[in-house]
Amino acid sequence: MSKPRLDQLLAGYADGDAISRQAVILRDVFRRWGYASEIFADPAHVSPTLRADCRPLTDYAGGPSDVALHHYGLASRASEVFTASKARKILIYHNITPPEFFRGFDDALAAQLAAARAQVAEVARRCETAWAVSQFDAEDLAALGAPNARVFPLVFSAAPLELTPDADLTARLTAPLTTLLCVGRLAPNKRIEDLIQAYAFYHFRINPFSRLLLVGSDRSCPRYFTMLKMLVGDLDVPNVCFEGFASPAGLVSYYKLADLFVSCSAHEGYGAPLVEAMFHGVPVIARAAGGTAEALGGAGVLYDDMQPAELAELFHRVASERTMRDQICAAQQRRIRDVLARPVEQELRALLTDFLPS
């Protein structure tokens, strides 16, 4: 009897995308085990640099003995191809941002998100099992009508973070300034406006020799990005740098330049950049929301319900009090050691016991 294929179906496949990185890690594991494995995605949503690394959805044709894994974060053509497949099906749930965050900024996207949340239970019912990348996501999936998801946390790979930093970017940004860093899409659920307001207080009242680097695509929600730019102008706060999308080498540079990593996100399924920042030894301050606490694993600094002045004072203490900073960084390094020692392949084999030949 021939081995089953282990293929993955994605709505899109992009540089710097956490779901895409997860798919690559799983594909590499499956191939290492000796299984044929490909990533299939909608060509309209594939980065030009990755077109040779995946196949179009129209090429997918899984048979009854094959296994199809679908990374679900938005209703898409990939979901349709997945549910119509004859293969045995596994849903991997990456969370769907609640649509209310986008209403007023992008009503069309809000409608897409609402549809995705409404459809996920039906997609899950057509699968033999569902995995969630955090306990928070498993509970969210249950609330949407698909209980009993098994938790398979987002897999961390250090390889992209061990690249040589971008020399030109490092030279451009090297300066005697306390650097606050935030990495992620500029989207309403990230609550970047909260970070900007706290930074304004920090810069004007506590440390004028400071800057805020916002690294991430501004295409996720153009109206929200415009609002953020207007807020910076209204506050007349300097050194707020919208850096846009970062290359892998550029991202390493940003982490190495940072004194603090801050996430004000009000909704996170997990939060991969939190782990990346800890890997680089950057103290992390994050809102206690969604799967953030799971990503931090008891490390970093979690906050909730802070006013801008209070959050600014927290920035100051973590950045300037050496003993506190050393304790935070030590706890983060313990967390990273645990993350790197995680038996990922053992977990995968256990999850796939009923799908692979013994």
Residue spans for each PLM region:
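Donor nucleotide-sugar binding/catalytic pocket of nucleotide-sugar-dependent glycosyltransferases
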Residues: A124-D166
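Conserved donor-binding/catalytic core segment of Leloir-type glycosyltransferases
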Residues: W131, A171-K190, I196-Y199, L213
